[in-house]
């Protein structure tokens, strides 16, 4: 089966693959961030959002993977084989978990639309030849201030502006203010 864990969130494995592997913080840092920001929601029996559910599943999956790795590490006698397993998990599975954790934490922190806009912006930036692109990559935390996110679907109904009143050409008279009305 070809399952893309980002599909229902409007992203894809391919879109996240534009971000270099060293972009993503360590699993430990991401777990600490998730715990600090969303512990109550993650531990709650209530359904909060699809991103909370996906984040919860990624945390549980990583825990199970570490349990399995500990078992393998304790039962493999050959140090070279043990090293191969550890490297494989850290390189392949670790990257996938780091991507998942980063994506869902970022969606909860900045909003899904902003994260998707960031992924597209970064993808365009990284594929543009260096001579034709700005020197610095887009930064997620600054996107909400610098980009306009357009929602898909129907555009909001535009209101026509109300007609302006015609102003007289004569200078406006100032009313004299009483001392009591000045603040």
Swiss-Prot record:
A motif (Bipartite nuclear localization signal) lies at residues 158-175. Residues 149-176 have a biased composition (Basic residues). The modification Phosphoserine is found at residues 155, 162, 170. Residues 155-177 are annotated as: 3 X 8 AA repeats of S-P-R-R-R-[PR]-S-Q. Phosphorylated by host SRPK1, SRPK2, and maybe protein kinase C or GAPDH. Phosphorylation is critical for pregenomic RNA packaging. Protein kinase C phosphorylation is stimulated by HBx protein and may play a role in transport of the viral genome to the nucleus at the late step during the viral replication cycle. It is found in: Virion; Host cytoplasm. It comes from the Viruses. Sequence repeats lie at residues 155-161, 162-169, 170-177. It holds the Pfam family Hepatitis_core. Residues 177-183 are annotated as: RNA binding. Keywords: Capsid protein, Cytoplasmic inwards viral transport, DNA-binding, Host cytoplasm, Host-virus interaction, Microtubular inwards viral transport, Phosphoprotein, Repeat, RNA-binding, T=4 icosahedral capsid protein, Viral penetration into host nucleus, Virion, Virus entry into host cell. One of its GO terms (cellular component) is T=4 icosahedral viral capsid. Residues 136-183 are annotated as: Disordered. Homodimerizes, then multimerizes. Interacts with cytosol exposed regions of viral L glycoprotein present in the reticulum-to-Golgi compartment. Interacts with human FLNB. Phosphorylated form interacts with host importin alpha; this interaction depends on the exposure of the NLS, which itself depends upon genome maturation and/or phosphorylation of the capsid protein. Interacts with host NUP153. This is Capsid protein. It comes from Gibbon hepatitis B virus subtype ayw3q (isolate Hope) (HBVgbn). The gene is C.
